[in-house]
Amino acid sequence: QNDSLLLADAQKFETLPFYKNLLYNKDSNAYIMAVSFIPDSINTGARTRIIRLLEEKLNVFSKNTNLAIHLSGLPYIRTIIADRIKKEMLWFLVGSLLLSAITLLLFFRSIPATLMSLAVVAMGVIWSFGTMVLMGQKITLLTALIPPLVVVIGIPNCIYFLNKYHTAYKETNDRSAAIIQMVSKMGIVTLFCNITAAIGFFVFALTKSPLLKEFGWVSGINIMALFFISLFFIPPVLSYLKPPSQKHVKYLENKYLTHLLVKIERWTFNHTKWVFGITLILVVFSIVGVLKIKKEAFIVDDLPKKDKLYIDLKWFEQNAGGVMPLEIVIDTKKKNGLIRSTKPLDHIETFQQFLLTQPELGKPLGLIEGIKFAKQAFYDGDSSSYSVPSGTEMAFIAPYLKPADGKTNPQANTPKSPTALLNKFIDTEKRATRISVNMKDIGSAQLPIFLKRMDSATQAIFDTTNYHVQITGSSVTFLEGSNFIIKGLGESIFWAFLLIAICMLFLFRSFPILMCSLVPNVVPLLITAGCMGWIGVSLKPSTVLVFSVALGIAIDVTIRFLVNYKQELPRLN
């Protein structure tokens, strides 16, 4: 008996066009359940707990019924990706520390020196997390890179300090004199290296993107903090440790390393034409690659194509039109403009028919669907009556859709009442309505073309003197966010070069040396961009930092070479 009732309800459900391609797809026998988050829980840690609990229940249901379950939606995708970023950040951090420890051990053959260096970067990492908390920032795709970045920049600081300490100790055989020489020689070098590296990342704070601003502030502050940690921690610790033994300074006389450096030196001075020629070829090759770079980002393009999150998103795109929210607001510019006549409804219906023809979109949901559903109900559920009411029919249906007095009819404005449902798509003055529609993740390159097509349709259907149409939603904000980040990259590189050039002029007081220092920093950026173009890596929020990292490392090496040159010039005349 229960099965027959259920079958009857299912048949009745499928006679309601309102739900077709919205909650079920008859062609693929797919049924969709929509879950909404309470606003108070959407941006809290409770979201992860709720989603995990939901997944457990659905997995049990899937096992018991042998039915395939697909989960997607913007809150779900963001939650899963955020959790993965936290886990991957931990592995990335541990991996960078482990590799750094192995490198230091192989290089210096000293456990105390290795532990001291790891302590410096560990303090830097703790400071980076503390800075994020103090500034009220959360772990995002970009800020998750800051702790490993601290390791990458902090370890060279330690290596240069230790290398100078070992070199000075070998010359003087006096620990105190070696520490003094280390601080006097490497202090200014490390200071300017960290200043320029901090500038390279801090300039992101000058952009309009909130995501890049957060990253710029935290990374800039913590890269400068690394200098003070290194300067205040390494010399005192070295003064308490035993002087380096012969084993610890043996790397200074490594014949293989010396042979390699001598070869590089010979090529630099004896084969200048070859060096410049190869560099020119690389630059030309890179410029061609730069022209191939695509500016395109997708919501889940950083996930493997075989990942369940990616597969489920594509399933929803095939069966439900996607999960990316798109909101269209239609304003009649007059109070009660939506109900004065059926003309606005006819225009909206024409526009929604256009939306149904767009392959990027799912089924639209708005005031028109509610009114057509109400008309069907008025005619005792006849599916052929699911259409926009005429003027006469609207006069009969309208009283049933008007907000009732909550005192005389407490059920009238409950969340499940028709009035409450319609109120979600119409404002209190009845002058504006919204259409909600899900769309596919078509990427930031195709989205402007799609929006231009939408704009042309709205101008053709709606008279701009009587209507104002606005297209918004997460799909549009995603595009704007991606564009802000990519534009911010160009701005940040410009400001980075300008500020770094000022630092170079202050440090060397020489325009030729300034030009000499900037050229080696432009070439790595060109090669980096060229490689991205040839390999097919798109310019997107998750890859823009590659340029800052390349600039930071190139500047670091350039300054160390030039400061060393400036220090040795008076001594060697």
What are these regions (language model features)?
Residues P236, K250-F298, D307, I311:
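Signature of alpha-helical transmembrane segments and their immediate interfacial
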Residues A101-L105, V121-A122, K138-I159, F202, ...:
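Hydrophobic transmembrane alpha-helices
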